[in-house]
A protein has these predicted regions:
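Ferredoxin-type iron-sulfur electron-transfer modules and their immediate structural context
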Residues: 2-169, 173-175, 181-227, 232, ...
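Short, recurring structural edge motifs at helix starts
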Residues: 220-221, 246-250
């Protein structure tokens, strides 16, 4: 009985070895040799595999760069590596790279513990996604930050952290690569990737679409859709009780004035972003 079992085990092991050898031979026979240039392109990439470029990962992006003609190549961008990496790849291909505008994530909410105090106690799983399924919000704002830091957990570059005093995320502009993981993760769509214009940004830090009086009861920093910003720049959209500043609006030309004129300080204007690392 034992000898028969032992024989069966040996047969199975033998078959496994034979199968492994056959698989190896087959893989070598049909192996696709990489071009030295394609290999060099892959090695030039940051290997973050974040998907911010729109491809499955760095290997997929390297293949796309290698196969691209001049027009296609100019449309390819590596947000993590930036212009330095794309210039290196362009040199390898003997092509010109497209222009890359610096961008970073912004949090379109200023629902801090002070501006939007808790009105309900949440005792469930400490996750934004979990909390979002069972309640409108700790402060009563149905669109505000839930303050559990799901975004922080998915940021692989250490660009996000929770401010213990305010309760909302802090963005380190020097580390943000615009990979978009925070945009995908936030159940309330509070993150947006926006351009940095000469070290400046301007945006509305609110997504509450309740009427002004109601919104202000839940958060003192809520947009009241007064329309003052739209009078400064007609490109600004005010609808559904909320203002939105398109990325075509110049932060350099209008940013400071827009922030100063906003009566509830819902418009945030950032400057000297090369030196100032954090959003407060």
């Amino acid at each position: 009985m034992i000898s028969a079992l032992f024989s069966n085990i040996l047969v199975l092991c033998g078959l496994a070895v034979i199968a492994a050898i056959l698989l190896y031979i087959t893989s070598q026979k049909f192996k696709m040799e990489k071009s030295p240039i394609e290999e060099a392109i892959y090695n030039a990439l940051p290997h973050a595999n974040c998907g911010a470029c729109g491809k499955a990962g760095c290997q997929d992006f390297a293949v796309a760069c290698f196969k691209a003609d001049q027009e296609e190549f100019e449309s390819l961008k590596c947000p993590v590596g930036g212009s330095a990496v794309m210039t290196k790849i362009a040199d390898l291909k003997g092509m010109k790279t497209g222009t890359m505008q610096k961008t970073c994530a912004v949090l379109r909410c200023n629902g801090t513990c002070k501006n939007a105090p808790d009105k309900v106690e949440y005792t469930g799983l400490r996750s934004c996604r979990a909390a979002n399924t069972v309640m409108s919000g700790r402060s009563g704002c149905p669109n505000g930050c839930l303050r559990f830091g799901d975004c922080v957990k998915v940021c692989q570059f250490g660009a996000l952290s929770l401010n213990k005093e305010t309760g909302i995320p802090i963005i380190d502009y020097t580390k943000c690569t615009s990979c978009g993981k925070c945009v995908q993760r936030c159940p309330r769509g509070l993150f947006e990737i926006r351009p940095i214009e000469e070290g400046q940004q301007v945006y509305v830090a609110c997504r509450n679409q309740q009427k002004g009086a109601v919104a202000r009861k839940n958060c003192t920093a809520a947009c009241i859709a007064c329309g003052k910003c739209a009078k400064i720049n007609p490109e600004i959209i005010v609808e559904n009780n909320l203002a939105y500043i398109p990325t075509t609006v110049s932060a350099v030309a209008d940013g400071e004035k827009l922030a100063a004129e906003c009566p509830v300080k819902a418009i945030h204007y950032r400057q000297n972003m090369q030196e100032n690392k954090h959003e407060n």
